[in-house]
Amino acid sequence: MTIAVGRVTKEENDLFDIMDDWLRRDRFVFVGWSGLLLFPCAYFALGGWFTGTTFVTSWYTHGLASSYLEGCNFLTAAVSTPANSLAHSLLLLWGPEAQGDFTRWCQLGGLWTFVALHGAFALIGFMLRQFELARSVQLRPYNAISFSGPIAVFVSVFLIYPLGQSGWFFAPSFGVAAIFRFILFFQGFHNWTLNPFHMMGVAGVLGAALLCAIHGATVENTLFEDGDGANTFRAFNPTQAEETYSMVTANRFWSQIFGVAFSNKRWLHFFMLFVPVTGLWMSAIGVVGLALNLRAYDFVSQEIRAAEDPEFETFYTKNILLNEGIRAWMAAQDQPHENLIFPEEVLPRGNAL
C-alpha cells in the first residue's frame, strides 16, 4: 500500500491569510503588519501636534501663548507639557482630570501626552516597518537596528526623563523655541555640556556628518565611466546601473592623506553606521542618568579656590556661575506657581564683577 504524505490544502483561506495577503501586497506605499501600528499612531501624533500648535493655548499650564491663533509663528508655537500639578497622569480624555471635556483636556495639556505616546509608538512602528520590509526582500536588518538610535533618544528625553522628575511638566514641549528652552534648562540644572555621555553624543553626530561628507566626496571623486564631460555635474549620470567607482584609487588617496585608510567596503560602511548610532545611544543613556539626577563632572577644588581667591577663575567656574544664573532666572519664570523670589544679593556674580 502506498501512502502519500503532503501538505493539506485549505479550500478557504482563514482571516489571517487574507489580511496577510492584503497587508503585504506589492503597492506604491507598502502597508504591512507594521503599518497597523505606524500609520494610525503617526497620523494621531502629527494631527495632535498640528491641532495644538494652531489652536491650543499654554496659558493654563505655563502662563504662555503657544499657538498660531494667539500670534505665535512656526518657531515659537508649541504643544506644551501638562501642568506641574498633574505629575505623571496619562491625562486620558475620559480620565478624572478632563472627564470627557475636550476643551478642558486641551487646557490641561492632554495633547502633549497624546502626541508623546503616539509619537513613540509611531517611531517603533517605523522601525518594525524596516524589519518587515528587510525580511520581505531578504536584506539584513541594519536599517532597523540603526533607527533604534533616534528611538532611544526620543524615549529617553520625552518619556524617561520626566518620569524620573516630578512630572511631564519638565519634559520638552513640542516646538522649536520650546526645545531650545529645554536645552538651556538641561545646561543650567544638569551641566549637560560637561556630561561625558553628551560629549560622546556630539562626537557621534558630528563625526557621522564628517564621515558622510568624506565618503560622498570620495565616491564622487573616484567615479569613472560616468560620461565624457570634463565637469562632474555635466557628466554624472544618477541612473547608471553598475557600480563604477574605484575603491583602490580611494584607498590610495586616503593612505597618502592620513597614512591609514579603509580597504574593505563592509568595514567602512559599518563604521559609518556605528559612529552615529553609538553616539545617539550614549546620549540616551546620559539622559536616563539625568532623569535620576546623577551628576557629571564636578571640579569642586576649582570652585573652592575661585570662591577664596578673587583672581582665580577658569572656564569651568565661569560656566558654573552661568548655570546658577540660568537656574535662578529660569526657575522663577518656568514655575510661577512656586512663587520663587530671589533677592538681588543672592543672584550669582562672577569674580570679574
Curated annotation (Swiss-Prot):
Amino acids binding chlorophyll a ChlzD2: H118
Cofactor note: The D1/D2 heterodimer binds P680, chlorophylls that are the primary electron donor of PSII, and subsequent electron acceptors. It shares a non-heme iron and each subunit binds pheophytin, quinone, additional chlorophylls, carotenoids and lipids. There is also a Cl(-1) ion associated with D1 and D2, which is required for oxygen evolution. The PSII complex binds additional chlorophylls, carotenoids and specific lipids.
Binding site for pheophytin a: Q130, N143
Pfam families: Photo_RC
Alphabetized InterPro entries for the sequence: D1/D2, Photo_II_D1/D2_sf, Photo_RC_L/M, Photo_RC_L/M_CS, PSII_PsbD/D2
Binding, chlorophyll a PD2: H198
Single GO MF descriptor: oxygen evolving activity
Assigned EC number: 1.10.3.9
Modified residues (N-acetylthreonine): T2
Keywords, sorted A to Z: Acetylation, Chlorophyll, Chloroplast, Chromophore, Electron transport, Iron, Magnesium, Membrane, Metal-binding, Oxidoreductase, Phosphoprotein, Photosynthesis, Photosystem II, Plastid, Thylakoid, Transmembrane, Transmembrane helix, Transport
Catalytic reaction list: 2 a plastoquinone + 4 hnu + 2 H2O = 2 a plastoquinol + O2
Residues annotated as transmembrane: 41-61, 125-141, 153-166, 208-228, 279-295
Subunit structure comment from the entry: PSII is composed of 1 copy each of membrane proteins PsbA, PsbB, PsbC, PsbD, PsbE, PsbF, PsbH, PsbI, PsbJ, PsbK, PsbL, PsbM, PsbT, PsbX, PsbY, PsbZ, Psb30/Ycf12, at least 3 peripheral proteins of the oxygen-evolving complex and a large number of cofactors. It forms dimeric complexes.
Summary of the function given for this chain in its UniProt record: Photosystem II (PSII) is a light-driven water:plastoquinone oxidoreductase that uses light energy to abstract electrons from H(2)O, generating O(2) and a proton gradient subsequently used for ATP formation. It consists of a core antenna complex that captures photons, and an electron transfer chain that converts photonic excitation into a charge separation. The D1/D2 (PsbA/PsbD) reaction center heterodimer binds P680, the primary electron donor of PSII as well as several subsequent electron acceptors. D2 is needed for assembly of a stable PSII complex.
Name by which UniProt lists this protein: Photosystem II D2 protein
The species this protein was found in: Sorghum bicolor (Sorghum)
Gene field: psbD
